[in-house]
A protein has these predicted regions:
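Bacterial N-terminal signal peptides
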Residues: 1-9
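Beta-strand secondary-structure signal
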Residues: 23, 70-72, 82-84, 109-113, ...
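Sec/Tat signal peptide C-region and signal peptidase I cleavage site
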Residues: 10-14
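Short, solvent-exposed loop/turn segments at secondary-structure junctions
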Residues: 197, 549-553, 586-588
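Periplasmic polypeptide-binding modules associated with outer-membrane biogenesis and secretion
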Residues: 15-33, 46-293, 316-334, 368-371, ...
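Gram-negative/organellar outer-membrane beta-barrel architecture
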Residues: 132-140, 237-434, 501-503, 507-522, ...
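Conserved active-site loop/cleft motifs that coordinate metal ions or position small ligands
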Residues: 541-544, 577-583
Length: 605
């Protein structure tokens, strides 16, 4: 009696049903894409190693896979296809298909047997408009359909074609275009699918005056004015709306900007647009480290106040110390600047950039102590093009070996920039080009000269996935009509070092004095070719060949090129690559190193 009570008080644990080891094989295997699609949807395959189950669970998995795999066949255009799943040779649809326990060393065979049949094709494509008088408009939009008779009858392709059709209508100025109905009829006799779309284009519309919400420190009137200049009264187009959104993001004070279109037109027949924004933290700090053999360590940092006055103005204080370690801290180079960027300057589509700074440079080519000030107006011509210009002033002392002379320079700078790349630190496709011209006037000796510099680079994504990139760069500089001695030391052209010709010491290429120090020149030629190869998710490499020359007069010297070559390693981060390059000079001169190491953030160009 006592024994029975103990059993009732402490019941024996329920025995777990034995798990079954199994292995899945998909047949036939002659269509790799189809097999991959099946493996992507099959729970039998996904849970094979990670989630053991018993016989009933395995049977449930197999039966649940039947509709999934059937849909996968249809998604690839096999509308008449069939699938059969067998466990140890038994069809899982049979009532007696429940599998028995198996030896883990001999897993049960699970066969997924496909009978895809022929792939169905697109038959007739019809588009009907509501109202009927818009048929001509649909015929025009159909040029962007991306679907034609005879194409595989894949649902994803049909939906993509539908989206392309609506986008074409929206680009034509119809913001409310919609699909009223889509009829897809499969004919199993002809193995085709006929598609009929009924489309309502809706009315043509212009943009209404945009509204903005979500600001906490930024004046919303500023943003509404910026958006209205680009949208209000303009014919509707998704691209125009996206450009306005990017213009707001370009202010640099928002973490995101979302453009929401109204579902209906206003009473005056225009489309209201509402922008929702979220501001970034008001303050930001950052820094950068770099290293170059025979130049030393470079460290820079900045502090930024975004939206300092409520008009999306940005004040940045930044400093840099360079040549740390090459000659000791006493001969290091120091730079400090304060920059204020003001968008919508004077209520126009201009950005003003006011900058003051001080530099103390100790270089092999010259020593300079100077104060600088500049005022620049920038205007974007498009998403890829911008122009800028304005006056600048420099005053200080410059010379060599302690023989310093006073100088005062007035200049007026003008710049054109083109850039259609998407990543400033790691460009993989596109082009960049800039040309700047600055005439200078020396107030102390009444000397006049000008400096012109053009730089271009192209990037080719050879494999289409960013894994293999060919990068090309060229630069041409000239001081038209001037000899080298008429140009102040810091405004002369120099070549050599990181960002120029790797393998050589900074500024070392070109004419030299009796002490073997660079004199600079009145013209510049540089060219680079670099192959960038991704090896793994986080690692890559580069092979490069750089060349450059500095001419004594304003005519570029193509005959005196000095070349350097080498290899590099890239550690790829979410922000940009960390770069380590080793360059070897091919035209060594006196005191040139046998190699040089460069470490920095971002690609070399």
């Amino acid at each position: 009696m006592l024994f029975a009570c103990l059993l009732l008080a402490n019941p024996l644990p329920a025995q777990e049903p034995p798990t079954i080891a199994y292995r899945v094989e998909v047949t036939p295997r002659d269509d790799d894409d189809l097999v991959s699609a099946i493996r992507a949807v099959s729970q039998l395959i996904k849970l094979e190693e990670t989630a053991p189950t018993d016989g009933y669970g395995l049977l449930a998995r197999a039966r649940a896979d039947l509709p999934r795999i059937t849909e996968a066949l249809r998604a690839d255009g096999f509308w008449g296809g069939a699938v059969r799943i067998e466990i140890a040779g038994r069809d899982v649809t049979r009532p007696d298909a429940s599998p028995q326990a198996s030896d883990p060393a001999n897993p049960l065979p699970v066969a997924v047997i496909l009978t895809p049949g022929p792939r169905y094709r697109i038959g007739q494509i019809l588009m009907r408009s509501e109202p009927v008088q818009e048929d001509a408009l649909l015929e025009q939009a159909a040029a962007d359909l991306r679907l034609a008779e005879g194409d595989p009858a894949r649902p994803a392709d049909i939906l993509a074609a539908e989206a392309a059709l609506l986008l074409a209508l929206r680009r034509a100025g119809y913001p409310l275009a919609s699909v009223v109905a889509r009829d897809a009829v499969v004919d199993h006799d002809t193995k085709t699918m006929d598609i009929t779309w009924r489309i309502a284009a809706g009315p043509l519309a212009d943009f209404a005056r945009p509204t903005v919400a979500g600001t906490t420190r930024t004046d919303p009137a500023l943003l509404e004015r910026l958006a209205a200049r680009r949208l209000e009264g303009q014919p509707y187009s998704p691209e125009r709306l996206e450009r306005a959104r990017r213009a707001m993001m370009g202010l640099g004070v928002f973490s995101f900007v979302r453009a929401n279109e109204a579902p209906a037109l206003s009473q005056d027949g225009r489309l209201p647009v509402h922008f929702q924004v979220q501001e970034r933290p008001r303050h930001a700090v950052g820094g950068r480290l770099g290293f170059e053999t025979n130049y030393g360590l470079t460290a820079s940092g900045y502090w930024e106040n975004r939206n300092i006055f409520g008009g999306a103005e940005r004040l940045r204080l930044e400093g840099e110390v360079a040549r740390i370690g090459e000659t000791g801290v006493d001969n290091a180079t120091y730079r400090a600047f304060a920059t204020l960027r003001t968008p919508e300057f004077l209520g126009r589509d201009l950005q003003s950039v006011s900058q003051i700074g001080a530099v103390r440079e100790r270089l092999r080519a010259y020593d300079r102590d100077a104060a600088l000030a500049s005022f620049t107006l920038e205007h974007r011509l498009s998403d890829t093009m911008a122009i800028s210009g304005g006056p600048n002033y420099e005053e200080g002392r410059i010379g060599r070996d302690g023989d310093m002379n006073d100088f005062r320079l007035f200049g007026v700078m003008g710049t054109f920039r083109y850039d259609n790349t998407t990543n400033p630190l790691d460009p993989r496709q596109g082009q960049r080009f800039s040309i700047s011209a600055t005439p200078y006037y020396s107030a102390l000796d009444s000397n006049k000269f000008a400096r012109v510099l053009a730089i271009g680079s192209s990037y080719f994504d050879v494999t289409g996935d960013g894994g293999s990139v060919l990068a090309l760069r060229a630069a041409l500089g000239s001081a038209p009509g001037a000899d080298r001695d008429e140009i102040t030391l810091d405004k002369r052209f120099y070549a050599g070092g990181g960002g120029s010709v790797r393998g050589y010491t900074y500024q070392s290429i070109g004419p030299r004095d009796k002490g073997n120090r660079p004199l600079g020149g009145a013209s510049l030629v540089e060219t680079s070719i670099e192959w960038r190869q991704r090896l793994t998710r986080n690692w890559g490499m580069a092979a490069f060949l750089d060349a450059g020359s500095v001419g004594e007069d304003s005519k570029p010297d193509f005959g005196g090129l000095h070349a350097g070559t080498g290899l590099g390693v890239r550690y790829l981060t979410a922000i940009g690559p960390i770069r380590l390059d080793v360059g070897v000079p091919l035209n060594r001169q006196k005191d040139d190193p046998s190699f040089a190491i460069y470490i920095g953030f971002g690609q070399a160009f």
